[in-house]
A protein has these predicted regions:
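Enzymes and membrane/adaptor proteins characterized by extended Gly/Ser/Thr/Asp/Glu-rich
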Residues: 36-44, 48-157
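Mature N-terminal segment immediately following signal peptide/propeptide cleavage
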Residues: 10-38, 43
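Bacterial Sec-dependent N-terminal signal peptides
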Residues: 1-9
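Generic hydrophobic alpha-helical membrane-segment signal
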Residues: 8-10, 16, 77, 103
Length: 157
């Protein structure tokens, strides 16, 4: 249940912020390019320029380390005129994209678990880890139907 005491001020902020945007800025809010947190300075500079020039709505992080992703998240949020939506494609946890975190089991393994409570706790743990590093949205779970046992992409995930 939404706490109505706090819902109205947030809604007012959203409405007033949206109304203050130009058409170009509103269009920019629709875009979320991918940024590699293990990229080089040139890669980061391009991301910063895109945030400033196109008024991006968010960033999708991929490949890197936690420290670098947190640093970039803070830097990008500081230069953006509207808070960015930070996302990852981390269907089996952040270890899918971040090198210095412990992995969770692959989806095929989780599908064999009969304990819904355990699966719920695992999902909570994944969400908590991502929240701690500033991720708002995980593009997961997904439905990958493995119709070819030799599929190198889907495999056990």
């Amino acid at each position: 249940m939404t706490n109505l005491l706090f819902a109205q001020p947030k809604q007012n902020w959203v409405d007033s912020t949206y109304q203050s945007l130009t058409l170009e800025q509103k269009i920019g809010q629709l875009f979320m390019p991918m940024v590699f947190s293990q990229g080089d300075q040139n890669h980061y500079q391009k991301a910063i320029s895109a945030i400033e020039k196109y008024h991006l709505g968010g960033i999708i992080f991929s490949k890197g380390t936690i420290a670098e992703q947190v640093r970039l998240t803070n830097e990008f949020q500081n230069i953006s005129s509207v808070p960015l939506l930070i996302a990852m494609d981390a269907e089996w946890g952040m270890a899918m994209r971040i090198s210095d975190v412990s992995p969770f089991p692959f989806q095929m393994t989780l599908g064999a678990i009969q304990n819904d409570s355990l699966l719920y706790q695992l999902g909570q743990s994944m969400a908590n880890r991502q929240r701690r590093v500033g991720v708002h949205l995980n593009f997961a779970p997904v439905v990958d139907v493995n119709t070819n046992s030799k599929n190198p992409v889907i495999g056990l995930r």
